[in-house]
């Protein structure tokens, strides 16, 4: 596993390697621990029972921790999103990510505005804000304007609702940010 990660790092020298595992916590923690020291960032769920131990170990191995919170079934109110950012900040992670499902396009702005408010008021940690689902796709493109530091794409098969493939996302980002 570690050899494969090292090969990926060599192939993608210009990119950051983020390791994330969706499945049972025990297996995920094992995979993420193996990845520490090789990956640039490990994505750990905010509800992980070993989050503090994972963060301490990652620090020793010079790997950043992205603390994430996902709601695949709803978009909370702005205050709830802001409260979740503060709660995740207290874990000691390096980057804070919230991804929630948008049923309407207007809900995309709830998460983006909460992210912007958190960044302006606290500005302690880099953040990631994503509205999942087809109605949230705009957030994957414009979130940088609201303080979000990372967006996600896939190779060919989306790993989250509303996710673009890398080629399309790159094109949309170029158009949006006029980087042609």
Explain the meaning of each model-derived region:
Residues 1-38:
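N-terminal active-site wall of soluble small-molecule enzyme domains
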Residues 1-11, 26, 46-62, 76-79, ...:
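Active-site-adjacent beta->alpha loops and helix N-cap segments on the catalytic face
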Residues 5, 30-32, 54-55, 85, ...:
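Generic hydrophobic/aromatic pocket-lining and core-packing "Φ" positions
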Residues 14, 34-41, 57-67, 90-95, ...:
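Glycine-enriched alpha-helix->loop->beta-strand junction motifs that scaffold or abut catalytic
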Residues 18-24, 39-51, 66-75, 94-105:
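Catalytic beta/alpha-barrel core
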Residues 26-34, 77-87:
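Short, acidic/polar
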Residues 115-180:
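C-terminal alpha-helical cap/extension of soluble enzyme domains
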């Amino acid at each position: 596993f570690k050899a494969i990660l090292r090969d990926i790092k060599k192939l993608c020298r210009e990119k950051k390697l983020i390791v994330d595992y969706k499945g049972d916590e025990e297996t995920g923690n094992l995979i993420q621990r193996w990845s520490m020291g090789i990956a640039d960032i490990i994505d750990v769920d905010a509800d992980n029972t070993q989050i503090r131990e994972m963060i301490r170990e990652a620090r020793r191995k010079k790997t950043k921790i992205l603390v994430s919170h996902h709601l695949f079934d709803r978009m909370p109110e702005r205050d709830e999103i802001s409260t979740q950012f503060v709660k995740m900040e207290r874990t000691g992670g390096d980057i804070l990510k919230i991804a929630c499902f948008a049923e309407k396009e207007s809900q995309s702005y709830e998460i983006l505005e909460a992210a912007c408010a958190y960044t302006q008021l606290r500005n302690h940690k880099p953040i990631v804000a994503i509205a999942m689902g087809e109605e949230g796709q705009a957030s994957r493109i414009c979130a940088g304007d609201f303080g979000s530091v990372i967006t996600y794409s896939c190779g060919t098969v989306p790993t989250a609702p509303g996710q673009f493939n890398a080629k399309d996302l790159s094109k949309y980002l170029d158009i949006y940010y006029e980087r042609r």
